[in-house]
Design a protein with these regions (language model features):
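Acidic, low-complexity intrinsically disordered tails
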Residues: 112-115, 404
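Core catalytic lobe of class I
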Residues: 2-111, 124-368, 410
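PRPP-dependent phosphoribosyltransferase catalytic core
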Residues: 367-412
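Low-complexity, small/polar and acidic-rich linker and loop segments
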Residues: 116-122
């Protein structure tokens, strides 16, 4: 992510009327500077005259609250021409001392915020590619979803760009301002929630930073199911931060109870040299289910697809094992799976092999996905290997080495 940029997004301002909630104080400042027809140099000069450096101002890029220091706070309010309360409201906050007034005026606020009924007019969009049970669309996921009826999919899985400044296919922006990224995220989440059936489940895969915003937003409309930590394997350290070791996979249910939950079991982790258990199960060994161990909310057995021979495209792609677990856990055959960010097509490939109907969109290159679906041999082979371990306490290979070295087996 860039430390600085020349301008904020046009979508974030129009005259002095705010078009969205701001999630970064810096984004709000830059937007107001454009309203004043100021250059970036003019903006930085204003704060420099008040002994606030450019670096200090830029530090507000990732901050959704006003600075504590009075001089800094006063400079921000003076530049914006807004009171502290107005800034809080622009950031989407309702200060504690004003919450009673807010609740006392809910009906009036609701009238002011009444949405147009024309937001989701169904439109006909031609699929890029179809199978006997699936449809792939090439285009912006929000526009694609506007053509999907309410409450018609059983599972939504989304792996959006993480906004880390990576290069993807033309048209995909992975370097948005904080405010634009979160507002865009909320926009496609609204559509995902709309098309999800009651009792259906939504999974969002992202870095923890963004999932804190996503979880808070989904929690206002859906029922929390789980926050799963997916071990990211071999990540690089970040200066002055804890070592990043997981991706977040947040899951919510539309309504109170999920329509479908199929328990997933995995094999016991053993030493590949001697066959001994890596984890001590103590006196519970005799009670262990021969079909395997229940999956927890920490998934350490999902490995990233990094080797070129295993990848379908140049960019990152998701593991077949990850999608198999999510789809099998949350759906049954003939249920409908939707993925707004198709990527390399892993969701669609797995759904096709598992006999789930599917709908998907991808803004970038869809030809890669089409060829993957037309040639499923590699994915089928991966799925076959996964099922050798799935729902078995020990694989056939681990049974051999454990038997050889005198370790217990569930059937003996």
């Amino acid at each position: 992510m860039k430390a600085d940029y020349e301008s904020t997004d046009d979508e974030l301002h129009e005259g002095t009327r705010l078009l969205c909630v701001f999630f970064s104080v810096y984004d709000l400042i830059v937007s107001r500077s454009k309203d004043k027809n100021m250059t970036n140099d003019d903006m930085f000069s204003f704060f420099s005259a008040r002994k606030i450096s450019k670096a200090t101002l830029i530090s507000l890029q990732q901050t959704s609250f006003l600075p504590d220091k009075p001089a800094f706070k006063n400079a921000v309010t003076d530049f914006l021409g807004m009171s502290e309360l107005e800034i809080e409201l622009a950031m989407g906050h309702i200060p504690a001392e004003y919450r009673k007034s807010y609740y006392d005026n809910i009906s009036h606020i609701a009238m002011l915020l009444q949405k147009s009924t024309d937001d989701n007019v169904l439109r006909e969009i031609k699929p890029f590619f179809e199978t006997d049970i699936g449809k792939l669309y090439n285009g912006d996921c929000i526009e694609i979803m506007k053509g999907i009826p309410n409450s018609c999919v059983d599972l939504v899985f989304a792996d959006p760009p993480f906004n880390l400044g990576k290069t993807y296919d033309p048209g995909i922006d992975d370097n948005m301002t904080m405010s634009k990224y979160i507002n865009w995220t909320y926009e496609w989440l609204d559509q995902c929630i709309r098309i999800l059936k009651p009792g259906g489940r939504i999974f969002i895969y992202n870095i923890p930073k963004w999932c804190t915003y996503i979880a808070a937003y989904l929690g206002e409309q859906l029922t929390f199911w789980d926050w799963i930590a997916v071990d990211m394997k071999f990540s690089l350290p970040i200066q002055n931060r804890l070592y990043p070791a997981h991706y977040a996979l947040v899951s919510y249910i539309k309504g109170v109870k999920a329509t479908t939950f199929n328990n997933q079991r995995i094999s016991m982790q053993i030493c590949r040299h001697c066959g001994g258990e890596i984890k001590d199960y103590g006196g519970y060994k005799s009670k262990m289910n021969p079909n395997g161990i229940n999956v927890s909310d920490v998934w350490s057995d999902i490995y990233p697809v990094r080797h070129k021979s295993s990848k379908n495209r140049e960019y990152n792609e998701l593991s077949v094992k990850l999608l198999d677990r999510i789809i099998c856990m949350s759906t049954n055959e003939s249920d409908v799976v939707f993925d707004p960010f198709g990527g390399s097509g892993t969701t669609f490939a797995v759904a096709q092999l598992l006999k789930r109907r599917w709908i998907g969109s991808e803004l970038g290159n869809c030809e890669i996905i089409k060829q993957r679906l037309l040639n499923p041999e590699k994915d089928k082979a991966q799925l076959d290997r996964i099922y050798q371990e799935k729902n078995h306490l020990f694989t056939e290979e681990s049974k051999k080495i454990r038997r050889k070295n005198g370790f217990w087996l569930s059937e003996e």
